[in-house]
Regions:
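Catalytic domains of lipid- and phosphate-ester/thioester hydrolases
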Residues: 1-250
Length: 250
């Protein structure tokens, strides 16, 4: 991404509208977006330094392997707090902590922190789509309300998508730790435990790649839902590109 942006004289970053995908690719994309945001608000210069590539490439799984081998049952008796909410510690928490250590805590924010920047178009919108294990549907997560994707104008919706803010409308969903959303989209079996949402009955999440590994289906739904808006801006020669990320190579 750094090379691509450099090759067109820093014109690439300004033309990204949507980031979608699955697994570790979304973690790297989130870090890249965070660096773009810090550039916009004056915290740092352009993010073309190899230092940042090295940060996101650092080991993150050895700590999880150690916890698995020593049995993390005892760890679950511990808890931590974020934004006034208490959470049980597990291997997933260790994953997040290692990610923050590797990236200088740049991603240690709430999901809602990014809402005004996405709304103003300063940074691309990120949509995460972890798989709901209970029924196989996708949970669409963003700092913004995505009900325009989950509802269908012609009433032919397959109901395969669940909107995060609608599901957790009584739990102040935007207060969730952003790294927990990253983990939800990249929770691979046996490596990390499933994420359990505070619902009755409990909703459990796994890797987004189970349903939409490259974010292609979600991108098409996004485009279809906003087709009138896109047509309007195309008439005025205002264009932005959509970019899809995934950590898997086929």
């Amino acid at each position: 991404l750094q090379k691509l942006n450099q090759s067109i004289k820093n014109g690439f970053n300004e033309n990204i509208q949507l980031i979608a995908g699955a697994s570790g690719g979304m973690i790297g994309a989130a870090y890249y977006r965070e660096l773009l945001l810090e550039t916009k608000i004056g915290k740092q210069k352009l993010n073309d330094d190899e230092f940042y590539c090295d940060n996101i490439s650092k080991d993150i799984l050895n700590k999880l392997t150690f916890m698995a081998s020593t049995n993390d049952i005892f760890i679950r008796y511990q808890s931590c707090e974020f934004n006034g909410y208490s959470y049980v510690k597990d291997r997933g928490f260790a994953f997040e902590e290692q990610l923050h250590n590797n990236t200088e805590n740049k991603l240690n924010k709430s999901l809602g922190y990014y809402y005004p920047f996405e709304k103003e178009g300063k940074i691309p919108t990120m949509i995460f789509s972890p798989t709901i294990i209970n029924d196989g549907r996708r949970l669409l997560i963003s700092s913004q309300d995505l009900s325009f994707i989950t509802s269908s104008a012609n009433n032919n919706s397959s109901f395969e998508n669940v909107e995060f803010h609608q599901l957790l409308r009584n739990q102040k969903a935007n207060n969730v730790r952003f790294s927990s959303i990253l983990r939800a989209s990249a929770t691979f079996p046996f490596v990390m435990p499933m994420i359990t949402l505070p619902t009755i009955p409990e909703v459990q999440l796994m890797d987004a790649g189970i349903r939409d590994n490259y974010g292609g289906k979600l991108t098409m739904e996004y485009l279809f839902s906003l087709q009138d808006w896109i047509k309007f801006f195309n008439l005025h020669s205002i264009r932005r590109i959509l970019f899809i990320f995934s950590s898997n190579v086929s």
